Amino acid sequence: MEEQVANAIEIAGNPSSDQTIKAQAFDYLNQLRADPSGWQVCLSLFTKTPRRSDVVRHVALEIINSATQTGLVDIQGLSFIKDNLLTYLQQMYGPDGAAQSDPSNIQNKIAQTITYLFSALYATEWNTFFDDILRLTYNGPDSGVRDNTLGIIFYLRVINSIHDEIGDVLVSRSRAEQDRANILKDLIRERDVQKLVTSWQDILSQWQERNDLIAEMCLRAIGSWVSWINISLVVNQTMLDLLFRQLARVKDVDLHQGGEKVRDAAIDVFTEIVGKKMKPADKIDMIVYLNLESIVAQLTASPPLHEHRFTSKYDTDLAETVTKLVNITTVDIVKALDSEDADNATKEKAEALLQAFLPHILRYFSDEYDEICSTAIPCVNELLSYLRKVAKRNPAIIPQQSAMLLPILKAIIQKMRYDETSSWGTEDDQMDEMEFQDLRKRLNVLQQIIASTNEQLYMDAVSEVVRATFHNVRQSGGQIDWRDLDLALHEMFLFGELAVRCGGLYTKNKPNNPASERLIEMMLMMVESDIRSFRHPATQLQFMEICVRYSSFFEHHARFIPGVLEGFLQLAHHQMTKVKVRSWYLFHRLVKHLRNYIGNVAQTVIAALGDLLTINAEVPVEGPDGDDMSSEDHEGSADALFNNQLYLFEAIGTICSTSSVPLDKQVVYAQSIMNPIFIDMERNLGAAKSHDERALLQIHHDIMALGTLAKGFSDWIPGTSSPAVPPAPEISEAFGQVAEATLVALESLKFSFSIRTAARAAFSRLIGVRGSHNLPQLPRWIDGLLTQTSSKDEMALFLRLLDQVIFGFKTEIYGILDTLLTPFLQRVFAGISEPTTGTDDEIQLAELKREYLNFLLMILNNDLGTVIISTTNQPIFETVITTIEHFAKDVDDFPTAKMAFLVLSRMSNLWGGPDVVQPSNPANGTTPSQSALPGFTQFMITRFSPLCWALPMNPSFNPKDAQAKQVLGEAAALQKIIYLKTGPEYVRWLRETELPGMGMGPDLVNEYVGSLEMLDIKGFRQFFQAFIQRFSA
């Protein structure tokens, strides 16, 4: 069997193995892994001589580890594995160890196995665990020193592995696993920790100059274990002398890599010591005792960090290691200052330490390497948050804080600057750019803390940077480093978080606050410096972003608008795709904000952007991994370019429809954009009918562009009280061509999902520009948009659009709605009745049900309810009621059931006639209604009332569920409405038929009917919810 297992492992691990045989090998090994006795053959495979291949032995150990972890091995089996592995360790790592040791990956895997055995056996069966492993560190039983290299390295691997298993706080553990880990740590502290610490001291003192790997591993062990053992075991003179000796390596300018790792590991030990949980007073005393400020000062002054700074020899690993120590120490100092448990003496010491550490904080926070700066951000955040807290408590102290805040703020601003090596916008620079922008966001958090602590200090510092930069731009004729200009613009952009936080730059034509006033000054300097002509793409983008963000500035300084518009139109043709595409979006945003201030520039804009309005659809190309390479996720892809090109169409629509442009010119300009698109649609229609993919996509793009142009022309939303006014009849007529062209394409190409999608978007946008002129075409829109192949999602989206139409044109739509309601609802019913084929389909079905019910509510709430019961639509009325009844009983979809009851309540209010019972609380009564629909009162009693019980009587119904309670509340409201409409007739039905039919006795019936009669709707909702809980119990 051993050979069989070994062969399976070899096949599974061989990249050139036949895939079928490889799959069989994996299946076999997985069966072996699950077999309670599978570990036995693996143990033999691992320990047997001659040694098997490394891959066989590695996988064999993995299977053993899996068995020990998952409980497949009993105590006897674990002891058997332990004995065999101890024998193996003695042979391989003991005094008479093999000439050729195991490779590192095998050693780590054995250490892991030994760790799992420790976890299982140390508490009860193997209390000599550490003695047995420590025995490997000697070359013989009589040896007085730990002189066995192989054994020492393996022992330290086990020590570090045990910490990972039971002591590492970053490892996620279940409650049971954490409890077991805590028990093991307690046992170690009780039994063996002293001998372990002594062994580390022995190893470090004997091997620190002889073997860097051993020294580093030993220091890593000390650093990790110190977090959960008694601090005095490490913070004592013997251990500290050993640690200081390793720190002295920092003076060695020719230190090799192994020595550097030892040095860094020694610093990490101090970081772990400081990170240990203690009372504030004890922590501050320990920081003083360790003389950490002096240690950091010496490390900072060392050649790798001082002399070699700003050179290629600068040791960034050492700098980051020291920064971690500075960071954790500063955090604890600040915590002591902020602690209510710390006495005055402790706080005085902490204050002195903070002043001493501030130069170190600034040194590493302002380091030119972003990784080092990032490591210091947590402590700077803690410090600034503390200073803000103190300032809010005692504003008089703010001036005193300036000495500390200003250098930190200057460091933040300087770190916001691109470094000298950055090459913005290149393909290779994308990851660095993302990381730098992330750093900027984190730095801005710190900057905003300072702004909220000392607003004046922040405003002065940023203003000075911006002022000096724009002065240099003017003095040098634009010949300054793009990084400096980008920094000033970036700070201007961020300044808005303070300047416009209360609604905008201006209030009643005056600056909103002092920060707004400063920002307006900066904006004046920016536009007067003519930085739009500065050619670096980063600053060009920043310029546009700022103009859009602070567009209200131009409302009060309209003289600058022509120049800014000219700059945007130039950048719309930028050679770099990133800038060009972004400029299209920002241009759209700018003209939307400044619509009333732009003036009659439509002809100029159309001429300038005309070459960018040519639509050229590209069929997505599938990449080698099957992904769509033209998706929106790829900057510069065909999809992304077109989606941004749409912003140009909307922007042109906005500019052409301003009040400054004569109406006849508006029509001319609109047609100048539309006509080429109509020609293009006609040219591609034949190929599209033949399902040509590119032609279909071209027409999709054409329709989207026309719809977006319409959106730009009109902000008007029918049925709302928005300040926008309906467009002039001439404009509506012009866009009638768009509606007709879209419908012609839709009627020919309704088999295409993308065409339907584009047409639906166009229909939505044409509502605002065409108004009620769209209504006669509604049957054609429905016929094209709701086809046999339309998805539930499409139906739901179109229902939402129809809601918009009904709301906007409630007084004009009745006749059309009466004609199209039956065929339209039949299509919706077909979609609802289709079987679902997966989770996504179920989600779409639920959405369609809710949109259908919302559509009915929209009709009922806008005085169009009679259309449902008109002569034309009478045949479908029963189906409408049946679907609502079905939804009201759906225990798996409470939101839909709730809406179903809302619809039934609204119908009852409208068609149930006037109230025959005066409500106990008129405010909670029903709304005035028309005369009763013949036969509807009986219909409510016999059809609607039983529905209120159908859902709660379902065995799966949980009346305590929050959503279920909401459904019960609506069911109660429906019963109350039926009672108000029918009075004694409903009471008699409940007493004689409905309630007894559910098994209720006279007392329950009396209680129920009495509550229905006496309580208002709100009270009865609460009663019904509680009653169902009692009745279901």
From Swiss-Prot:
Annotated Pfam families: Exportin-T, Xpo1
Gene Ontology CC annotation, any one: cytoplasm
Functional summary from the UniProt entry: tRNA nucleus export receptor which facilitates tRNA translocation across the nuclear pore complex. Involved in pre-tRNA splicing, probably by affecting the interaction of pre-tRNA with splicing endonuclease.
Keywords attached to this entry: Cytoplasm, Nucleus, RNA-binding, Transport, tRNA processing, tRNA-binding
Family, similarity comment: Belongs to the exportin family.
MF-aspect GO terms: small GTPase binding; tRNA binding
The organism of origin for this protein: Coccidioides immitis (strain RS) (Valley fever fungus)
Record localization: Nucleus; Cytoplasm
PANTHER family per UniProt: EXPORTIN-T, EXPORTIN-T/LOS1
InterPro entries: ARM-like (IPR011989), ARM-type_fold (IPR016024), Exportin-1/Importin-b-like (IPR013598), Exportin-T_C (IPR045546), XPOT (IPR040017)
Gene: LOS1
An annotated GO BP: tRNA re-export from nucleus
Protein name: Exportin-T
